[in-house]
């Protein structure tokens, strides 16, 4: 699966969430509402999430391999960095980046979610930081 486009859809001026982003895979699948977040160790990419009945945020879409997570992180942060350095604000449809597709090896087929190396919906590093600010973005 290749990342064929990254769109910075909205810059968020205040708080830890810096941008809302869409990523296109193989030119046929778009995942929206990724967030560029300022964490204690720098910028990271948070996957789209929803608040469950317990008040915890769970990822709606998440990569099944560390390689795909890293490819998404690199593509999104690269597009965000290019946009912030250029000083160009996103236009309608977003600022496009990641023009060179990023190849990622296909993940092995999993029988069920119990085989995942993490809990589904666990955004890992930065999830707790994001939970504090995600409600403010969701309210917009």
UniProtKB/Swiss-Prot annotation:
One Pfam family here: SpoVG
Cell cycle recorded as keyword: yes
Region (Disordered): 88-127
Cross-referenced SUPFAM superfamilies: SpoVG-like
GO terms, biological process: division septum assembly; sporulation resulting in formation of a cellular spore
Database matches in InterPro entries: SpoVG, SpoVG_sf
Chain intervals with Acidic residues compositional bias: 112-124
Keywords for the protein's UniProt record, in alphabetical order: Cell cycle, Cell division, Septation
Keyword Lipid biosynthesis in record: no
Matches recorded under PANTHER family: SEPTATION PROTEIN SPOVG-RELATED
Main function: Could be involved in septation.
Similarity comment: family membership: Belongs to the SpoVG family.
Protein known as: Putative septation protein SpoVG
Organism expressing this protein natively: Symbiobacterium thermophilum (strain DSM 24528 / JCM 14929 / IAM 14863 / T)
């Amino acid at each position: 699966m290749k990342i064929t486009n990254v769109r910075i859809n909205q810059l968020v001026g205040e708080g830890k969430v810096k941008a809302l982003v869409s990523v296109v895979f193989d030119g046929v699948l778009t995942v929206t509402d990724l967030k560029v977040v300022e964490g204690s160790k720098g910028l990271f990419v948070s996957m789209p999430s929803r608040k469950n009945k317990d008040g915890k945020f769970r990822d709606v879409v998440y990569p099944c391999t560390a390689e795909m997570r890293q490819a998404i992180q690199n593509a999104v942060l690269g597009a965000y960095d290019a946009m912030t350095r250029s000083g160009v604000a996103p236009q309608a449809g977003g600022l496009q980046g990641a023009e060179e597709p990023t190849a990622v090896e296909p993940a092995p087929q999993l029988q069920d979610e119990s085989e995942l190396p993490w809990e589904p919906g666990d955004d890992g590093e930065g999830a707790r930081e994001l939970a504090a600010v995600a409600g403010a973005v969701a309210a917009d």
